[in-house]
Swiss-Prot record:
PANTHER family per record: BIOSYNTHETIC PEPTIDOGLYCAN TRANSGLYCOSYLASE, MONOFUNCTIONAL BIOSYNTHETIC PEPTIDOGLYCAN TRANSGLYCOSYLASE
Keyword GTP-binding: no
Main location: membrane
Transmembrane region(s): 20-42
EC number: 2.4.99.28
Function field: Peptidoglycan polymerase that catalyzes glycan chain elongation from lipid-linked precursors.
Membrane topology according to the record: Single-pass membrane protein
Protein name per UniProt: Biosynthetic peptidoglycan transglycosylase
Localisation per UniProt entry: Cell inner membrane
Pathway membership: Cell wall biogenesis; peptidoglycan biosynthesis
Name of one Pfam family that matches: Transgly
GO biological process assignments: cell wall organization; peptidoglycan biosynthetic process; regulation of cell shape
Keyword annotations from UniProtKB, A to Z: Cell inner membrane, Cell membrane, Cell shape, Cell wall biogenesis/degradation, Glycosyltransferase, Membrane, Peptidoglycan synthesis, Transferase, Transmembrane, Transmembrane helix
Length: 245
Protein backbone atom coordinates (compact mmCIF):
# COMPACT_ATOMS: atom_id res chain seq x y z
CA UNK A 1 0.00 0.00 0.00
CA UNK A 2 2.85 2.39 0.83
CA UNK A 3 4.38 1.82 -2.60
CA UNK A 4 1.07 2.54 -4.31
CA UNK A 5 0.62 5.77 -2.34
CA UNK A 6 4.13 6.92 -3.26
CA UNK A 7 3.41 6.30 -6.94
CA UNK A 8 0.23 8.33 -6.72
CA UNK A 9 2.05 11.22 -5.06
CA UNK A 10 4.70 11.16 -7.82
CA UNK A 11 2.04 11.26 -10.50
CA UNK A 12 0.23 14.07 -8.70
CA UNK A 13 3.23 16.40 -8.84
CA UNK A 14 4.12 15.62 -12.44
CA UNK A 15 1.90 18.38 -13.92
CA UNK A 16 3.59 20.89 -11.63
CA UNK A 17 6.99 19.79 -12.87
CA UNK A 18 5.83 20.23 -16.44
CA UNK A 19 4.58 23.71 -15.66
CA UNK A 20 7.89 24.62 -14.06
CA UNK A 21 9.76 23.18 -17.03
CA UNK A 22 7.58 25.03 -19.54
CA UNK A 23 7.98 28.23 -17.56
CA UNK A 24 11.75 27.81 -17.53
CA UNK A 25 11.81 27.27 -21.29
CA UNK A 26 9.64 30.34 -21.84
CA UNK A 27 11.79 32.48 -19.54
CA UNK A 28 14.95 31.29 -21.27
CA UNK A 29 13.51 32.09 -24.70
CA UNK A 30 12.39 35.52 -23.51
CA UNK A 31 15.81 36.33 -22.07
CA UNK A 32 17.50 35.12 -25.27
CA UNK A 33 15.25 37.43 -27.30
CA UNK A 34 16.11 40.41 -25.11
CA UNK A 35 19.81 39.61 -25.43
CA UNK A 36 19.43 39.47 -29.22
CA UNK A 37 17.83 42.91 -29.25
CA UNK A 38 20.53 44.33 -26.98
CA UNK A 39 23.39 42.93 -29.08
CA UNK A 40 21.81 44.32 -32.26
CA UNK A 41 21.48 47.76 -30.71
CA UNK A 42 25.09 47.67 -29.48
CA UNK A 43 26.27 46.85 -33.00
CA UNK A 44 24.33 49.83 -34.35
CA UNK A 45 26.62 52.09 -32.37
CA UNK A 46 29.16 51.39 -35.13
CA UNK A 47 27.23 50.09 -38.15
CA UNK A 48 23.96 51.11 -39.78
CA UNK A 49 20.91 48.82 -39.71
CA UNK A 50 20.40 47.15 -43.06
CA UNK A 51 16.64 46.89 -42.67
CA UNK A 52 13.88 46.93 -40.06
CA UNK A 53 11.03 44.59 -39.16
CA UNK A 54 8.60 46.91 -40.96
CA UNK A 55 10.78 46.97 -44.09
CA UNK A 56 11.07 43.19 -44.20
CA UNK A 57 7.31 42.76 -43.86
CA UNK A 58 6.69 45.31 -46.62
CA UNK A 59 9.31 43.70 -48.86
CA UNK A 60 7.45 40.39 -48.62
CA UNK A 61 4.09 41.95 -49.51
CA UNK A 62 5.54 44.08 -52.31
CA UNK A 63 7.15 41.00 -53.85
CA UNK A 64 3.63 39.60 -54.33
CA UNK A 65 2.48 42.61 -56.37
CA UNK A 66 1.99 42.31 -60.11
CA UNK A 67 4.54 43.34 -61.24
CA UNK A 68 6.66 42.83 -58.11
CA UNK A 69 7.77 46.04 -56.36
CA UNK A 70 10.60 46.79 -53.97
CA UNK A 71 11.08 48.77 -50.78
CA UNK A 72 12.48 52.26 -51.43
CA UNK A 73 15.22 53.02 -48.91
CA UNK A 74 18.59 54.75 -49.01
CA UNK A 75 20.67 55.46 -45.92
CA UNK A 76 22.19 58.92 -45.67
CA UNK A 77 24.36 60.34 -42.85
CA UNK A 78 22.78 62.57 -40.23
CA UNK A 79 24.43 65.72 -41.55
CA UNK A 80 23.00 65.09 -45.02
CA UNK A 81 19.41 65.38 -43.80
CA UNK A 82 17.82 68.83 -43.73
CA UNK A 83 17.60 70.50 -40.33
CA UNK A 84 14.11 71.55 -41.40
CA UNK A 85 12.98 67.93 -41.40
CA UNK A 86 14.66 67.23 -38.07
CA UNK A 87 12.92 70.18 -36.45
CA UNK A 88 9.58 69.32 -38.06
CA UNK A 89 9.66 65.76 -36.74
CA UNK A 90 10.57 66.83 -33.22
CA UNK A 91 7.88 69.54 -33.26
CA UNK A 92 5.31 67.02 -34.46
CA UNK A 93 6.24 63.75 -32.77
CA UNK A 94 8.23 64.40 -29.59
CA UNK A 95 8.90 67.98 -28.49
CA UNK A 96 11.08 66.90 -25.54
CA UNK A 97 13.08 64.31 -27.47
CA UNK A 98 16.46 65.98 -26.84
CA UNK A 99 16.02 65.89 -23.06
CA UNK A 100 13.63 63.04 -22.22
CA UNK A 101 14.63 59.47 -21.30
CA UNK A 102 12.68 57.88 -24.11
CA UNK A 103 9.32 57.99 -22.34
CA UNK A 104 6.56 60.56 -22.02
CA UNK A 105 4.59 59.44 -18.98
CA UNK A 106 1.84 62.02 -19.45
CA UNK A 107 1.32 60.93 -23.07
CA UNK A 108 1.23 57.26 -22.05
CA UNK A 109 -1.38 57.96 -19.35
CA UNK A 110 -3.47 60.01 -21.77
CA UNK A 111 -3.31 57.18 -24.31
CA UNK A 112 -4.36 54.70 -21.60
CA UNK A 113 -7.43 56.77 -20.73
CA UNK A 114 -8.31 57.19 -24.41
CA UNK A 115 -7.98 53.45 -25.05
CA UNK A 116 -10.08 52.64 -21.98
CA UNK A 117 -12.81 55.01 -23.14
CA UNK A 118 -12.84 53.49 -26.63
CA UNK A 119 -12.63 49.90 -25.40
CA UNK A 120 -9.71 49.15 -27.72
CA UNK A 121 -6.18 50.35 -28.43
CA UNK A 122 -6.31 53.48 -30.57
CA UNK A 123 -3.37 55.46 -29.16
CA UNK A 124 0.07 54.66 -27.76
CA UNK A 125 1.61 57.92 -26.58
CA UNK A 126 4.90 56.92 -28.20
CA UNK A 127 8.03 59.07 -28.23
CA UNK A 128 10.47 59.06 -31.15
CA UNK A 129 12.56 56.40 -29.40
CA UNK A 130 9.51 54.22 -28.80
CA UNK A 131 8.51 54.53 -32.45
CA UNK A 132 12.01 53.49 -33.45
CA UNK A 133 11.89 50.47 -31.13
CA UNK A 134 8.66 49.34 -32.80
CA UNK A 135 9.90 49.95 -36.33
CA UNK A 136 13.20 48.12 -35.80
CA UNK A 137 12.02 44.95 -34.11
CA UNK A 138 8.25 44.63 -33.72
CA UNK A 139 5.05 44.58 -35.76
CA UNK A 140 2.19 46.95 -36.49
CA UNK A 141 -0.10 44.93 -34.23
CA UNK A 142 -1.61 46.97 -31.40
CA UNK A 143 -1.50 45.06 -28.11
CA UNK A 144 -0.36 45.65 -24.56
CA UNK A 145 2.15 42.81 -24.85
CA UNK A 146 3.78 44.50 -27.83
CA UNK A 147 3.70 47.81 -25.97
CA UNK A 148 5.51 46.23 -23.04
CA UNK A 149 8.24 44.89 -25.32
CA UNK A 150 8.45 48.30 -26.99
CA UNK A 151 9.14 49.93 -23.62
CA UNK A 152 11.95 47.46 -22.88
CA UNK A 153 13.62 48.05 -26.26
CA UNK A 154 13.23 51.80 -25.73
CA UNK A 155 15.23 51.50 -22.50
CA UNK A 156 17.94 49.57 -24.38
CA UNK A 157 18.15 52.20 -27.12
CA UNK A 158 18.37 55.06 -24.65
CA UNK A 159 20.98 53.23 -22.56
CA UNK A 160 23.29 52.16 -25.38
CA UNK A 161 22.98 54.94 -27.99
CA UNK A 162 23.20 58.71 -27.71
CA UNK A 163 20.28 60.87 -28.81
CA UNK A 164 21.79 61.95 -32.11
CA UNK A 165 22.44 58.33 -33.13
CA UNK A 166 18.89 57.35 -32.15
CA UNK A 167 17.54 60.21 -34.25
CA UNK A 168 19.80 59.34 -37.19
CA UNK A 169 18.53 55.76 -37.25
CA UNK A 170 14.94 56.99 -36.87
CA UNK A 171 15.29 59.44 -39.76
CA UNK A 172 16.64 56.67 -41.97
CA UNK A 173 14.08 54.01 -41.06
CA UNK A 174 10.71 55.64 -40.39
CA UNK A 175 7.92 54.77 -42.84
CA UNK A 176 6.60 57.45 -45.21
CA UNK A 177 4.23 55.44 -47.38
CA UNK A 178 3.80 51.93 -48.71
CA UNK A 179 7.34 50.67 -49.23
CA UNK A 180 8.89 54.13 -48.66
CA UNK A 181 11.34 54.27 -45.76
CA UNK A 182 13.68 56.95 -44.53
CA UNK A 183 14.14 60.64 -45.21
CA UNK A 184 16.08 60.24 -48.45
CA UNK A 185 13.54 57.91 -50.06
CA UNK A 186 10.65 60.13 -48.89
CA UNK A 187 12.24 63.32 -50.23
CA UNK A 188 12.85 61.74 -53.61
CA UNK A 189 9.46 59.98 -53.74
CA UNK A 190 7.34 63.04 -52.89
CA UNK A 191 9.51 65.97 -54.04
CA UNK A 192 12.20 64.49 -56.32
CA UNK A 193 14.98 66.11 -54.31
CA UNK A 194 17.54 64.76 -51.80
CA UNK A 195 16.75 64.94 -48.09
CA UNK A 196 19.42 67.61 -47.64
CA UNK A 197 17.38 70.08 -49.73
CA UNK A 198 14.01 69.77 -47.99
CA UNK A 199 12.51 73.15 -47.15
CA UNK A 200 10.48 74.05 -44.08
CA UNK A 201 7.06 73.59 -45.72
CA UNK A 202 8.01 70.31 -47.38
CA UNK A 203 9.39 69.04 -44.08
CA UNK A 204 6.26 70.03 -42.19
CA UNK A 205 4.06 68.16 -44.68
CA UNK A 206 6.24 65.05 -44.36
CA UNK A 207 6.01 65.25 -40.57
CA UNK A 208 2.21 65.30 -40.73
CA UNK A 209 2.25 61.95 -42.51
CA UNK A 210 3.96 59.87 -39.84
CA UNK A 211 1.00 58.68 -37.77
CA UNK A 212 -0.71 57.37 -40.94
CA UNK A 213 1.84 57.43 -43.78
CA UNK A 214 -0.07 55.10 -46.09
CA UNK A 215 -3.30 57.04 -45.72
CA UNK A 216 -1.58 60.35 -46.47
CA UNK A 217 0.25 58.77 -49.40
CA UNK A 218 -3.12 57.82 -50.88
CA UNK A 219 -4.74 61.19 -49.98
CA UNK A 220 -2.08 63.71 -50.90
CA UNK A 221 -2.92 67.37 -50.62
CA UNK A 222 -5.74 66.92 -48.12
CA UNK A 223 -6.98 69.98 -46.25
CA UNK A 224 -6.03 68.42 -42.94
CA UNK A 225 -2.45 67.87 -44.07
CA UNK A 226 -2.12 71.52 -45.03
CA UNK A 227 -3.67 72.75 -41.77
CA UNK A 228 -1.56 70.47 -39.60
CA UNK A 229 1.60 71.33 -41.56
CA UNK A 230 1.00 75.02 -40.85
CA UNK A 231 0.85 74.29 -37.11
CA UNK A 232 4.07 72.26 -37.25
CA UNK A 233 5.84 74.93 -39.29
CA UNK A 234 5.08 77.50 -36.58
CA UNK A 235 6.54 75.22 -33.90
CA UNK A 236 9.70 74.27 -35.76
CA UNK A 237 11.71 77.26 -34.56
CA UNK A 238 11.39 76.11 -30.95
CA UNK A 239 12.31 72.48 -31.65
CA UNK A 240 15.52 71.46 -29.86
CA UNK A 241 17.82 69.15 -31.81
CA UNK A 242 19.87 66.50 -29.97
CA UNK A 243 23.60 66.97 -29.56
CA UNK A 244 26.12 64.19 -30.22
CA UNK A 245 27.99 62.93 -27.16
Amino acid sequence: MAAVSGTRRTRAVSPTRWIVYAGSVFAGAWLATQLFYLVQIALWSFINPGSTAFMRTDAWWLSRDKPPAQVQHQWVPYDQISRNLKRALIASEDSTFATNNGYDVDAILQAWEKNKARGRIVAGGSTITQQLARNLFLSREKSYIRKGQELIITWMLETVLDKERIFEIYLNSVEWGRGVYGAEAAARYYYRIPASRLGAWQSARLAVMLPKPRWFDAHRGSAYQAQRAAVIARRMGAAELPQSQ
